Swiss-Prot record:
Domain of life the protein comes from: Bacteria
Keyword Ligase: no
Function: Involved in transcription antitermination. Required for transcription of ribosomal RNA (rRNA) genes. Binds specifically to the boxA antiterminator sequence of the ribosomal RNA (rrn) operons.
InterPro entries, per the entry: NusB-like_sf, NusB_fam, NusB_RsmB_TIM44
Record's protein name: Transcription antitermination protein NusB
GO MF annotation, one: RNA binding
Keyword ATP-binding appears in the UniProt entry: no
GO CC annotations on file: cytosol
Family, per entry: Belongs to the NusB family.
GO BP: DNA-templated transcription termination; transcription antitermination
């Protein structure tokens, strides 16, 4: 089992294997959507197959701290946890099939400070996967989905991007699933 900090200053809590595979599926889906966004000739079924077979994805550059704290951290390539294949494929195929609708929802949820043309490809991929999951996967609690995608954004960006991802996904979730936030149905 892996540990995850729930809140700053709180004790880490154990995550189940299923939760870890779901998180890995979300990260892999963001990576796959990024590939599909940038590679005009990429086919969604081939990208899904490449990720599931391990020929794409599955690795990350991680920072490793010096145990004595004398030297700067070093970077190493590490294997990622295997993703939940069903969730991964559903997110990639679904988001890719619904790009126009997702982009419209995202565009309507952006603030004036973050117009569509300011979004980098990684941010677009994070938002597309997150919005698709919020709209189409009712069994995922919205707060869980939002946290997962904000964490993914934070893995790529140290600036304002994770906060923007949080704001957009929160707006979408509150509109699409108000009952999860104490709103009416």
């Amino acid at each position: 089992m892996a540990l995850q900090d729930d809140k700053p200053g709180s004790a880490p809590k154990e995550r189940s294997g299923r939760q870890i595979r779901s998180s890995a599926a979300r990260l892999a889906a963001v990576q796959a959507l990024y590939v599909l966004d940038l590679a005009e000739d990429a086919r969604v079924d081939q990208v899904v197959l490449d990720f599931m077979s391990g020929s794409m994805g599955g690795m990350a550059i991680v920072e490793v701290a010096d145990p004595e704290g004398i030297f700067d951290p070093t970077e190493e390539i590490a294997a990622l946890e295997p993703p939940d294949g069903e969730l991964f494929a559903m997110l990639v195929r679904g988001a890719h099939a619904e790009l126009a609708r997702l982009d419209e929802v995202i565009g309507a949820s952006l603030s004036a400070d973050w117009p569509w043309d300011r979004l980098e490809p990684v941010v677009r991929a994070v938002l597309r996967a997150g919005v698709y999951e919020l709209l189409e996967r009712q069994r995922t609690p919205p707060r869980v989905a939002i946290k997962e995608y904000v964490d993914i954004a934070a893995a790529f960006y140290s600036g304002a991007e994770p906060g923007m991802v949080n704001a957009v996904l929160d707006r979408v979730a509150r509109s699409a699933r108000p009952e999860a936030f104490g709103g009416g149905v």
